[in-house]
Amino acid sequence: MQTTDLVRFKKLGKQITVLTAWDAISSSIVEAAGADVVLVGDSLGMVVLGHSTTLPVTLDQMLHHTKAVCRGFCRPLSKQPLVVCDLPFLSYQCGEDKAVEAAGTLLKNSTASAVKLEGAEPETLLVIKRLIRMGIPVMGHLGLTPQSVHQLGYKSQARDKDSQEKIFKDSKMLQESGCFAIVLEHIPAEIASRLKKHIDIPVIGIGAGSDCDGQVRVTADILGLSIAQPPFAKPLLAGRELCINALKEWINSTDLDQVNPTTKTSESKSDC
């Protein structure tokens, strides 16, 4: 999968599916499920590392998890999902050179193909243009931007006329700066629907209604593994309960070495 495929999908009216992964196990599952894009999001700071925000996530941690995600794929590189990784807080806000170094570190040391960053401030637009000149594809992110949590909070954005006009202007600027797609997080559905028609690049929604060019979800939310479930992410599986019950069954077993008599470990099948 390539970035140009996503633009083609928009023209064809094909929904784009984006799921997060944070290690080899999660990426192998997401790949087998058929996602178009795997996002190594800095949300791993909350989902995996136990932080209350994404702000503590470092570039070294993003590289560690991105490499693990890329090692988990089974298919040949040309048939793998597109891998996009987040640039963590303060890895691109402090200047173009630092942003190029951060993005280059992630892409040179993994098979990731693109980076995602938040906002459309003038300094951010300069960073995006510089990255693209260096041959690094960029996905934008507007609406609820978790790296601005102390300024904007974890709440729905673009609720009034001024902020709605700004998000339309920002999306246009991200497109003109060269972004291949934009994530819209936690904004009114009618605004996302209008914005989708306002720009030529794909609009990927999360908590932004169903009328987007695609949807992105945190995999742990879909599987019901998250401790704090977002209001816009309905779980499709009671994952925590299933895992807890399975582990309890093993813990309470009289024979901890017991193997399911109908299953031989040597005959287990891989999705590869």
UniProtKB/Swiss-Prot annotation:
Binds 1 Mg(2+) ion per subunit. It is an enzyme of class 2 (transferase). One of its GO terms (cellular component) is cytoplasm. Keywords: Cytoplasm, Magnesium, Metal-binding, Pantothenate biosynthesis, Transferase. It catalyses: 3-methyl-2-oxobutanoate + (6R)-5,10-methylene-5,6,7,8-tetrahydrofolate + H2O = 2-dehydropantoate + (6S)-5,6,7,8-tetrahydrofolate. It comes from the Bacteria. One of its GO terms (molecular function) is 3-methyl-2-oxobutanoate hydroxymethyltransferase activity. Its main location: cytoplasm. Its EC number is 2.1.2.11. The keyword Cell division does not apply. GO terms for biological process: pantothenate biosynthetic process. 3-methyl-2-oxobutanoate binds at D42, S43, D86, K116. InterPro entries: Pantoate_hydroxy_MeTrfase, Pyrv/PenolPyrv_kinase-like_dom, Pyrv_kinase-like_dom_sf. The active site is at E185 (proton acceptor). Its cofactor is Mg(2+). It is found in: Cytoplasm. PANTHER family: 3-METHYL-2-OXOBUTANOATE HYDROXYMETHYLTRANSFERASE. Catalyzes the reversible reaction in which hydroxymethyl group from 5,10-methylenetetrahydrofolate is transferred onto alpha-ketoisovalerate to form ketopantoate. This is 3-methyl-2-oxobutanoate hydroxymethyltransferase. It comes from Prochlorococcus marinus (strain NATL1A). The lineage of its organism: Bacteria, Bacillati, Cyanobacteriota, Cyanophyceae, Synechococcales.
